[in-house]
A protein has these predicted regions:
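"A position-specific structural signal for the A-helix of alpha-solenoid helical repeats
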Residues: 6, 41-42, 75
């Protein structure tokens, strides 16, 4: 994992999802971005912190498509379980 991702993880630990989102979106806009699965996973985490479940799940799905065995797989399942438990009427898989 690059130093940039470590800085973004620190922003998330510091409850600064908006700054993390801005950095990740700028990173993903670069034409030579690598480690895309990690970037989408972290972006999903940032949106989860903001309780934007739709964007969190969309980004976890992108990460899983790129790396089916990465940490986004568990995060995606957890997000779906949380929504199913707390917002059963709003979430219908």
């Amino acid at each position: 994992m690059t130093a940039d991702f470590e800085n973004i993880e620190q922003l998330l630990r510091d409850s600064k999802p908006d700054e993390a989102i801005a950095r990740l979106e700028a990173y993903l806009a670069t034409p030579v971005a690598s480690c895309l699965d990690v970037a989408y996973y972290l972006l999903g985490n940032a949106y989860r912190q903001k309780s934007d479940w739709r964007k969190a799940i969309n980004n976890y799905n992108r990460a899983v498509q790129l790396n089916p065995d990465g940490p986004a797989k568990t995060a995606l399942q957890t997000a779906k379980e949380i929504l199913d438990f707390f917002n059963h009427d709003l979430y219908n898989p």
